[in-house]
């Protein structure tokens, strides 16, 4: 089942901020730079991917819901630290 969450990252971050986001991506478990996703390419049986949308950073994955929740919590914590602003579910 596909899990998804939109994080409160605007699509107009500066280049320096996007560089920090990219560094956080690479520090997360399962990062596959060649696919710009984690654990597998977007169409695989197990993956997490992120895309920049007008509403924020969309993170979605075909992965166990509890694993996804924990993984996204870690991603938010790392992004918060790297960017110096709180990153969380945009719909909260």
Language-model regions, residue ranges each:
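Structured alpha/beta or helical-core interaction and ligand-binding surfaces enriched in interleaved
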Residues: 1-92
């Amino acid at each position: 089942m596909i899990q998804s969450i939109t994080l409160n990252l605007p699509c107009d971050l500066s280049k320096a901020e996007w560089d920090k986001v990219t560094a956080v991506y690479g520090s997360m478990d399962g990062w596959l730079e060649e696919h710009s996703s984690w654990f597998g390419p977007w169409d695989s049986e197990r993956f997490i991917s992120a895309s920049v949308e007008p509403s924020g950073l969309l993170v979605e994955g075909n992965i166990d819901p509890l694993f996804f929740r924990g993984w996204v919590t870690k991603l938010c914590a790392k992004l918060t630290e790297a960017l110096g602003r709180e990153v969380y579910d945009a719909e909260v």
